[in-house]
């Protein structure tokens, strides 16, 4: 018989840096999960990724207090800001621009995000990432 699912927990945890402090500890603790077991498993799975990059993770909690988790790709805005070397997006994206991104950079980000995007082809994925860039106040060239 399959295990009964109790809850889903969605977090963003820096790659390779999960520890029992907030937000991980309280989120897992309230469901009675072994926090250190998750931290060790998450850090082992994300050790080859760039350290400090926020990784979305969905933790499935079962009724016997066991769990499984699935990691996603880093958020597109984080990858875009890293590509242009900016600290944050623009508060007024239509008037104040924070940087410029080229099509090849967008393609690289789209390849990274491909497993989590619902685009039908790579060109659609690039256009989706370009839309995110424009909404952050980043000039897009070549799209």
Curated annotation (Swiss-Prot):
Posttranslational mods: One or more lysine residues are methylated.
Question: What GO terms in the biological process aspect are recorded for it?
Answer: translation
Q: How does it assemble?
A: Part of the ribosomal stalk of the 50S ribosomal subunit. Interacts with L10 and the large rRNA to form the base of the stalk. L10 forms an elongated spine to which L12 dimers bind in a sequential fashion forming a multimeric L10(L12)X complex.
Enumerate the UniProt keywords alphabetically.
Methylation, Ribonucleoprotein, Ribosomal protein, RNA-binding, rRNA-binding
The entry assigns this protein to a family as follows: Belongs to the universal ribosomal protein uL11 family.
> Which pairs of positions does the record mark as disulfide bonds?
none
Task: Name the InterPro entries for this protein.
Answer: Ribosomal_uL11, Ribosomal_uL11_bac-typ, Ribosomal_uL11_C, Ribosomal_uL11_C_sf, Ribosomal_uL11_CS, Ribosomal_uL11_N, Ribosomal_uL11_N_sf
Q: Which Gene3D superfamilies match?
A: Ribosomal protein L11, C-terminal domain (1.10.10.250), Ribosomal protein L11/L12, N-terminal domain (3.30.1550.10)
A Gene Ontology term for the protein's cellular component: cytosolic large ribosomal subunit
Q: Does the keyword rRNA-binding apply?
A: yes
Q: Which Pfam families match?
A: Ribosomal_L11, Ribosomal_L11_N
Annotated PROSITE patterns: RIBOSOMAL_L11
Q: Which residues form the signal peptide?
A: none
List the molecular function annotations (GO) for this entry.
large ribosomal subunit rRNA binding; structural constituent of ribosome
Free-text function comment from the UniProt entry: Forms part of the ribosomal stalk which helps the ribosome interact with GTP-bound translation factors.
Is Hydrolase set as a keyword in this record? no
**Protein name in UniProt:** Large ribosomal subunit protein uL11
The gene name reads rplK
Under the heading HAMAP family, the entry gives: Ribosomal_uL11 (MF_00736)
């Amino acid at each position: 018989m399959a295990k009964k699912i109790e809850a889903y927990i969605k977090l963003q945890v820096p790659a390779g840096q999960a520890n029992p402090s907030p937000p991980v500890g309280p989120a897992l603790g309230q469901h009675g999960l072994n926090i250190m077991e998750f931290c060790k498993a998450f850090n082992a799975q994300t050790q080859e990724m760039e350290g400090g990059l926020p990784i979305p993770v969905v933790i499935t909690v079962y009724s016997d207090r066991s769990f499984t988790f699935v990691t996603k790709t880093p958020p597109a805005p984080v990858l875009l800001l890293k590509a242009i070397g900016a600290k944050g997006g623009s508060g007024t994206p239509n008037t104040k621009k924070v940087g410029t991104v080229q099509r090849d950079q967008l393609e690289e980000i789209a390849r990274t995000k491909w497993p989590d995007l619902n685009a039908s082809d790579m060109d659609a994925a690039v256009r989706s990432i370009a839309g995110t860039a424009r909404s952050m106040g980043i000039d897009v060239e070549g799209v």
